[in-house]
């Protein structure tokens, strides 16, 4: 297959590079050792791909018109084939079973912060982050679930009776099916179009710059050659300063740390794992060295992905 051929080609390139390094003068031994370590780090994930599956089937949480479906279209294309699932974990299960090629799931909102369930689920299922995209969360009047993000609007329109609904797109679907002129919903423009609703007012959310960042999840490690963001997950030994030591590694190698999250390990009381995002490409020497040193200092360590920043 093409994947097997690419894997064999990667292996051959790595071997040729090692042979060339081995012929270098002995005075450069330390440099050779460092380069070999970098090559070995990349070789350990030699089965990685640089391109995505053509014409993929992509899963997301929600129904048609959800912001998650919009994220699928943003990352892949307007014509991408998608399938919605009731819960976040249903997407992971579908990916595990091979029912879909990729999953697109929210990881962070600029107003409300991290979506912790998806940090926990990607760790639980052992998948990889292969890309990300950001969606402008413009809540438009036609229905409900943007209540927390649109409270200012309702304060100014107190004659309305806001009622929570499970999902913005589901709210739009409900209003469309109810055909009751006294009902409205708050949802995306996409939902408005899909369910044939009339746009009453656009962008009613409090924060006009509100965005949600979505991650693209895969069973396989895919790293485009122009990747510029790395995600890792790890646990640490119970030693004073162990976390600061990990963070010092990023400073030592000039790696720009973007995000750090700590999450409790559900199966182990008072134990935590850490999720870190930093900028870089694993093919670069300083980045591969930083990854290697982090791995050496951690109790457990996993490279979640190296992909293009949104």
Labelled PLM ranges:
Residues 1-310:
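Domain-level signature for soluble enzymes in the chorismate/prephenate branch of the shikimate pathway
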């Amino acid at each position: 297959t093409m994947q097997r051929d690419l894997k064999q080609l990667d292996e051959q390139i790595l071997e040729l590079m090692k042979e060339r390094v081995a012929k270098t003068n002995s005075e450069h031994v330390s440099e050779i050792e460092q380069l070999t370590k970098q090559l070995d780090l990349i070789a350990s994930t030699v089965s990685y791909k640089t391109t995505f599956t053509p014409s993929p089937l992509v899963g997301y949480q929600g129904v048609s018109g959800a912001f998650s479906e919009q994220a699928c279209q943003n990352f892949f294309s307007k014509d991408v084939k998608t399938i919605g699932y009731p819960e976040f974990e249903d997407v992971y299960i579908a990916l595990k079973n091979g029912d879909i090629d990729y999953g697109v799931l929210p990881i962070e909102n600029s107003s409300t912060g991290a979506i912790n369930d998806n940090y926990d689920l990607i760790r639980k299922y052992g998948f990889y982050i292969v890309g990300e995209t950001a969606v402008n969360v413009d809540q438009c009047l036609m229905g409900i679930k943007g209540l927390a993000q649109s409270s200012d609007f309702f304060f100014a329109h107190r004659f309305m009776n806001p009622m929570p609904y499970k999902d913005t797109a589901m709210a739009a679907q409900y209003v469309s099916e109810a055909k009751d002129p006294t009902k409205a919903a708050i949802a995306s423009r996409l939902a408005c179009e899909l369910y044939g609703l009339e746009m009453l007012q656009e962008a009613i959310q409090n924060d006009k710059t509100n965005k949600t960042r979505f991650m693209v999840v895969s069973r396989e490690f895919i790293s485009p050659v122009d990747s510029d963001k790395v995600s890792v997950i790890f646990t640490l030994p119970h030693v004073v300063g162990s976390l600061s030591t990990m963070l010092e590694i990023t400073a030592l190698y000039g790696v720009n740390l973007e995000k750090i999250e700590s999450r409790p390990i559900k199966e182990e009381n008072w134990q935590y794992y850490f999720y870190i995002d930093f900028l870089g490409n694993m093919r670069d020497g300083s980045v591969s060295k930083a990854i290697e040193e982090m791995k050496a200092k951690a109790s457990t360590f996993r490279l979640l992905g190296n992909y293009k920043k949104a």
